[in-house]
């Protein structure tokens, strides 16, 4: 994939996430330096199209990471002691 294709995909995913923020403001928050997606909403907002690369617990946080339409998506949540 060349540079222009990557930029195009990045613009597409940005538009997709902005649309999700408008439709589901309680689940998606975009600020200057980050995009936050509610943990339970991650799979619902990005079904089947997310190719999970990693799912792990580190320093009290559970992380999910994967690719969606050429963009790398990350979400995490604090793990309660009874879940660890």
Language-model segments: what does each one mean?
Residues 1-2, 78-84:
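Short intrinsically disordered terminal tails
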Residues 1-34:
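Contiguous, amphipathic alpha-helical segments that mediate oligomerization or scaffolding
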């Amino acid at each position: 994939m060349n540079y222009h294709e990557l930029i195009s995909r990045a613009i597409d995913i940005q538009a997709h996430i902005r649309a999700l923020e408008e439709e589901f403001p309680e689940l998606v928050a975009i600020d200057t330096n980050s995009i936050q997606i509610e943990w339970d909403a991650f799979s619902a907002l990005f079904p089947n199209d997310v190719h999970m690369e990693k799912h792990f617990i580190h320093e009290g946080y559970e992380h999910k990471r994967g690719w969606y339409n050429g963009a790398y998506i990350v979400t995490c949540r604090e793990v309660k002691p009874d879940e660890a």
